[in-house]
Amino acid sequence: MTIEEKGKISPRKKIKGLEERYKEARQHIAVAILKESPPAEDVDISEAYQQSRSLLGDYVTLDWQHRQDILRIINQIKRYADDDTRRRPLNIIMQAEPGSGKSHMVNCLARKLEPHHAAAVNFNMASLQSIDDLSQPLDAVRNLKVVDRLPLLFLDEFDSNPANFATLLPLMWDGELQISHRDLMLGKLVIILAGSGKNIEQVMKSAKAMQTPPEAQETKLVDLLSRINGGELEIPALDTVAGDRDRRIDKVCLTIALLQSRFAGKLETIPWALLRFVVMSKFRYGVRSIAHLVDLVSPLQENAKAMQLSDLNLPLLSVPVLRDSSLAYHVFSEDGPAAIIELWTECCKSEIAVRIRKQGEEEEYF
């Protein structure tokens, strides 16, 4: 064995090392934000946050299992893109709650796959009134193929109307769809179907167990799922806590990403109270609701790098103020609105600052 061969690090060791860095990043944020009592002094989680951006940029996660699931899908798409003999669509199914950032994830996925000429086209199937409504996204797909791009066609809420299942079957099988007098031939593309219905999971389980569908009307769904040839991807709920898994850590990273996106990546420190409130609160629509909270933060002075607790001005001073605000549609508590106000008041007792970006560090935010 040569010296060079001895010095090589095996892929397994590299993965193990990366997994350890993810674990350390999670622990760092957990100690800083998730502990019951606030830290005694200002904390720096900038490196842990940067680790959450390492796979998909603005789609942040420190959840190792979720990262591995995403990576598996990325590799599936790469292999498909590089294989000129595969001309049928690559079909992927995504399971996620409403408001979980599905379209944002697909857009970040397309940016990650730019070396493979990927580009995203998004369409919400809940808005589909007739098959003619599919003309716009499919024409966008055709336009991308003209310039040699690999379209990622994202069809959100595909399960909102089971009557649409039959419409999707020819599209998923050979990339072809008849719309009025037009025969749209799409050929090679990636189709990502996203749904949130529990019947999807039930039908997938029964199909994998080679059992009959739970209900006779699920036959078309089984037929559709039989065309899934690119794998499955689940976006776990943000309040999932099970064993070593704590998705609340991703709520911290997500809040930072949303703040940096809004303020052009200039922020270096933010209040601990805001991150603690997000971690401990229940949001009705997941990512969408946290984004709404971030949008309610008052504008900062131009080129401001530090966000103070007094800068926030959130509608959380009292129950009447909360009830009269748009935030009332997004945050909830089993103990009622008074518990939300009490949580915010408790969080605001600490004026600890959290460093989220090193001084002078430059970064691209989308």
Show where each model-derived region lies.
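Conserved AAA+ ATPase small/helical "lid" subdomain
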Residues: 1-19, 228-309
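Short glycine-rich substrate-engagement loop in P-loop NTPases that contacts/grips substrate
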Residues: 117-148
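Conserved nucleotide-binding/hydrolysis micro-motifs of P-loop NTPases
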Residues: 98-100, 127-130, 159-161, 191, ...
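Conserved AAA+/SF3 P-loop NTPase catalytic/coupling segment centered on the Walker-B
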Residues: 147-174, 183-192, 197-207, 221-227
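Extended, charged/polar low-complexity intrinsically disordered regions
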Residues: 1-84, 196, 293-336
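Walker A/P-loop nucleotide-binding motif
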Residues: 85-105
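N-terminal accessory segments that target, anchor, or regulate ATP-driven/P-loop NTPase machines
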Residues: 1-16, 101, 225, 275, ...
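Post-Walker A helix-loop "phosphate-sensing" segment adjacent to the P-loop in P-loop NTPases
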Residues: 111-120, 176
